[in-house]
């Protein structure tokens, strides 16, 4: 699941692996706290995922670049410092340029520091692979996380409000067609949505495995 550099590795397969097989939510089952908390809308999902993607790329790149010079006794503290540096950049940029989104995401922006996805990729991949492939891994995992948060946020926002309108752009408006279920924008809706999606994903994987795929 977390390979060292192999002769048969290529950037495209590594990128796709992060979106599909090792998807942070449906493959590795990591980072569920922000996934549950911030996916009340597509806008929130995009904001959190883009921030996490930036931190993933930056921390993977930096950890991979300095990995041979990090003593084992201080490995984790060094990784946390690196991650916290990039999270601070995200926090300051969001506060300056997207204040409404910054307020909406709240404490979950600084909590990216301890997001299992970011720490997990630094530990399991960046420490064992070169800079280029560590960046590719981060892009794949970050893109997979982005797609999942958009999907979950879209489902919850549509069923909870009848409208999907990220950043003021109305993409779907079914307010006059469906009766919004407000609980979908609350915690029970988050658990229900993720449970249904995980059930579908696991069922499809079992079907594929049964067919020898």
Curated annotation (Swiss-Prot):
The keyword Nuclease does not apply. Its EC number is 7.2.1.-. It holds the Pfam family Rnf-Nqr. The Rnf complex is probably composed of eight subunits, including RnfA, RnfB, RnfC, RnfD, RnfE and RnfG. Belongs to the NqrDE/RnfAE family. This is Ion-translocating oxidoreductase complex subunit E. Disruption phenotype: Deletion of the rnf operon abolishes growth on acetate and ferredoxin:heterodisulfide oxidoreductase-coupled Na(+) transport. The lineage of its organism: Archaea, Methanobacteriati, Methanobacteriota, Stenosarchaea group, Methanomicrobia. It is a multi-pass membrane protein. The chain crosses the membrane at residues 25-45, 46-66, 77-97, 100-120, 135-155, 181-201. GO terms for cellular component: plasma membrane. NCBIfam families: PRK12405.1 (NF009070), rnfE (TIGR01948), rnfE_Methano (NF041839). GO terms for biological process: electron transport chain. It is found in: Cell membrane. HAMAP family: RsxE_RnfE. It comes from Methanosarcina acetivorans (strain ATCC 35395 / DSM 2834 / JCM 12185 / C2A).
